[in-house]
Amino acid sequence: TYICYKKKLIITSMKKLFILALSAITMAFTTSGTKSLHDFKAKTLEGADFNFADLKGKKVLIVNTASECGYTPQYKDLEALYEKYKTKNFVVIGFPCNDFGGQEPGTSKDIKAFCTKNYGVTFQMMEKVSIATSPIYKWLTKKSENGVLDATVKWNFNKFLVDEKGNLVKYLPSNTKPMDAEITNWIEGK
């Protein structure tokens, strides 16, 4: 009887171990390895902490910006887009970047003054980043991170559209104008 008791104990332990292993395997296959935009934090141009979780429920256009680029006049249309749709749960987030042609050499103070004086920018501008090392841009550009697409940011003013749940929807190149129907239709849900 002692041997029977030991066998039952071993079998019970093995069943528990099997159930735990099966649960772990199930979780591994059902849990997505991708994050959402809402998992990130960054610094604003003014140096304040910014939690992207605060954007839950809003559509977001993220753009890498530069003050000395041929596409710099897009600031005007980015601001117009933001002003038109900000009451409809839409925001624009600008990330100054000096990676392409050294076209954003200024300090945070310089960038803020330039954007305000020349384009009246009121949408959220973040601290200057490098595309190659920014965690948010890693998420935006790697399918293994965002679960949607791989993208190569080739120049300034590349745009990424992110839905209300923080999921990446689309990548658009520099020459896509901020008021392009593809963007406005997406904001309007068309």
Annotated model-derived regions:
Residues 71-134:
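Structural microenvironment flanking redox-active thiols in thiol-disulfide oxidoreductases
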Residues 6-17:
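Positively charged n-region of N-terminal signal peptides that target proteins for export
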Residues 17-26:
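Sec-dependent N-terminal signal peptides
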